């Protein structure tokens, strides 16, 4: 285990990504190089504690230069530390971008400036997303994919903000999941407005699959009416006087940060989503909202 909190947070992120074996080896290479760069005091001090600071351009610039020079190799090659190959350099850059995207940060073209944020999807892309979700429903899905599929389907119907989605409860669903009640909280403040929204066949099916998974999880956690719940045991992040945290079982309410994280991780994990989803859930919400306004006129 690394002595640096930022690298320990990176380890957790890598586990959450669920990358394939080949990609995980590449990501582990980057993880090792970043840890060695920190041990050399080659990166900003803030990068030791914060994963976000570790993945900012201020830290990644010197890291990439050191790594490409061969200084961060974990073993010598013919007695020396030669520069890494161009193929390895390209893999490193791709891994860095993947890690940044998993945190909701824009990709970087290191040495060539930032790549702008991916624009909000157009109506055609939203339709393609719905078709992709429908394909998921036709096959077997993990609990995480089942939850994300239901979340995205609800988003396509409601254009709800992440906070509005996070507080949904099972009693906010109509009979046979034919409608969902959502309370709008305007970003600039103002009166809260609630409305019932008719759901699509896609959303009804996706919610049905998720509710079956959710039922078993909630029973083990002694029950909650929140629609979105955690899939695995975790901790509440608060230290007691002895430096310990409270363990939370699976089936506990998923807070807004957890919901957003599930979106970011799922976007990278499941086939077809990276090309269809923007970096942030809020960008998807705006696209859905714009599409709803177009069809209403």
Q: What is the predicted role of each segment?
A:
Residues 1-17:
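N-terminal DNA-binding module of tyrosine recombinases/phage integrases
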Residues 13, 33-34, 99, 210-213, ...:
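Conserved hydrophobic/aromatic "anchor" residues
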Residues 16-107, 199:
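Non-catalytic DNA-binding core/recognition domains of DNA-processing enzymes
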Residues 104-137:
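Flexible interdomain linker/hinge and immediately adjacent N-terminus
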Residues 131-162:
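Basic, Lys/Arg- and aromatic-enriched nucleic-acid-binding interface segment
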Residues 155-178, 297:
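Short, charged phosphate-coordinating catalytic segments
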Residues 176, 185-266:
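Basic, alpha-helical nucleic-acid-contacting "clamp/cap" segments
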Residues 249-297:
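Short, basic (Lys/Arg/His-rich) helix/loop patches that form interaction surfaces
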